[in-house]
Amino acid sequence: MEIKVTEIKENKLLGRKEIYFDVIHEGEPTPSRKDVKGKLVAMLDLDPETTVLQYIKSYFGSRVSKGYAKAYESKERMLYIEPEYILVRDGIITKEEE
């Protein structure tokens, strides 16, 4: 699995960086969210507690998936802005923490 960052936008109003990337997975199934997030965080030197993987989209017959992640400046801002289901899906909070 290889990740190529296609665009990084600074969103000062929401206090985050918006990261668009391609995941190249030749001869492999689409990688898990956990694997992609781990590699992206390590590659860009981000904090895993304030980084949210919004989506990974795979297209039939393609060996490349497209993804979108958001890296927040603080955990408080992330918890205020992001929908609960995204935080649960990324493992940042659990369902019981509501």
Curated annotation (Swiss-Prot):
GO biological process: translation
GO annotations of cellular component type: ribonucleoprotein complex; ribosome
Bilayer-crossing regions: none
Superkingdom, taxonomy of origin: Archaea
Keyword Transferase: no
Residues spanning the signal sequence: none
One matching Pfam family: Ribosomal_S24e
One Gene Ontology molecular-function label: structural constituent of ribosome
Keywords: Ribonucleoprotein, Ribosomal protein
Family under the similarity heading: Belongs to the eukaryotic ribosomal protein eS24 family.
Protein name: Small ribosomal subunit protein eS24
Organism: Thermococcus onnurineus (strain NA1)
Lineage: Archaea, Methanobacteriati, Methanobacteriota, Thermococci, Thermococcales
Primary gene name: rps24e
